[in-house]
Amino acid sequence: MLAVIDVPTTTWLGQRDHLLLTLMFNTGARVSEIIGVRVADVVLGTTSCVRLHGKGRKQRSLPLWKEAAREIRDWLSLNPQLEAGSVLLPRRDGGPMTRANVTQRLRLAVATATACHPELGKLSVSPHMIRHSTAMGLLQAGTNATDIALWLGHESPSTTHMYVEADLAMKERTLARLKPPEVRATRYRPPKRLVQFLQSL
């Protein structure tokens, strides 16, 4: 996933796309949530965070990596026209990105990354796959299912169960590659005193 995020940043679109993909991976946000982020939703400071507007008008704030916060600062410096009420990641015309825009830009990023990482060409990388990667990363880092559900904005922790199952399946595949040692079962022979005691009962 990091290879996909590492898009060239020599153009305005490249800088926006890099920030877009970084925030998607950092937060695990839904596409609708990430394209709805406004400048006022970002808090940059000792502890930086972004406020996401999820399903059912529910809001949640998520911490940002220092690198992501730094990238947002640079982006805002390069785009002084962006006001508090402006979308953080606009199109060229200043309007908000659409789901189709995000899918298209992600597809382009994957195509660019495939030149250096051919294995990516075999994968179907989608916005939801980035969200899934965030969930799996949290799980493998030891985060419990309830906290992952809160992070992703799931209505119920039971929705997160599929990520736990996916991680278990991954571990089972790893275990299957390990051949168990060939230990021959030996017959247990109890001590004579134990046999006599059991016979006396």
Where is each model-derived feature located?
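Conserved catalytic core of the tyrosine transesterase superfamily
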Residues: 1-201
